[in-house]
Amino acid sequence: AQASKGYIDPLVGRVEEVERVCQVLARRRKNNPLLVGEAGVGKTAIAEGLAKMIVEEKVTDILRNSVVYALDLGDLLAGTKYRGDFEKRFKGVLAELREKEGAILFIDEIHTIIGAGAASGGVMDASNLLKPLLTSGKIRCIGSTTFQEYRGIFEKDRALSRRFQKIDVSEPTVEETVGILKGLKSRFEEHHKLKFTQAALKAAAELSARHINDRFLPDKAIDIIDEAGAYQQLQPPSKRKKVVGVGDVEAIVAKMARIPPKSVSASDKEQLKGL
C-alpha cells in the first residue's frame, strides 16, 4: 500500500542483493531470505525496494502478483493481558497470510520474534509458531537483522536459522553511495525546497566516510544531506540559500563530527607536508 502511494524512496544499486532475494523467494521450500548487515547499510531499503518493484511490475512473472506485508510486533503485543492472547493474534495473522496468494511477510529486526510473547518459563514464542509454516514454504518471509544479533540471538535457534537463507548486505563504497544520493536527490530537494549540487553529494559521501566513524554508509551520508537541507530551512528567508554546495556540507560534517570546519576538507597530503 505504501509503495503504490509513492511513500517509499527508490532503491538505487543493490542489484546483486535484490536478485538473490528474488531467487530465494522463488524456491519451493525454505524460501525465506534473511538480510544480514550492519545498522544503516540499507537492509530495510532492500525489502521496501522489492515492494516498490513489485508494484511497478519490474520483477519476474513468479513474483508479479506478490504483496509484501510488514509485521509490527509492537501492535501484536500491545494489550495482551492473558496467556494465549498474543498467540491467538499471531496465529490469526499467519492464517490470514496463508490464504492470501503471493503474500510475503517482512519482519524487520527479526531477532525480536525469539522470545516474543513467551510467558515466564514458557517455550511457545512467536518464532515457534512461525517455524512449521516456514519449512513448508506456505508463507514466504523476509527477515533483517545485524551481524551482532544474528550471531548472539538468531543463530542460537538452529531450527529457525536453517529455515532462512542468509544474504550478507555489505556497506556500499563511496562511489556507490554517491550514486544512491543522486537517486534520492529529487526527494530531498522536494522536501527542503532547494537544490543540491553534484559536488555537495560527492562531498557528503566522502566526508562522512572519513570523519563519522561510528556509523555506516549510505545512512550517514543521507543524514548529512538531509541535515544540510534542514539547516537552510531554519534560516530566515533573506539568508536562505536556494542551492546547497560543498561549503554547507562541510559545515554540517564539522558540527556532527565535532571537528573544526577548517580541518574537514583538508587533505592528508597537505597535513603530511607540514610534518
Language-model features: locations:
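AAA+ P-loop NTPase nucleotide-binding core of proteostasis motors
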Residues: A1-L275
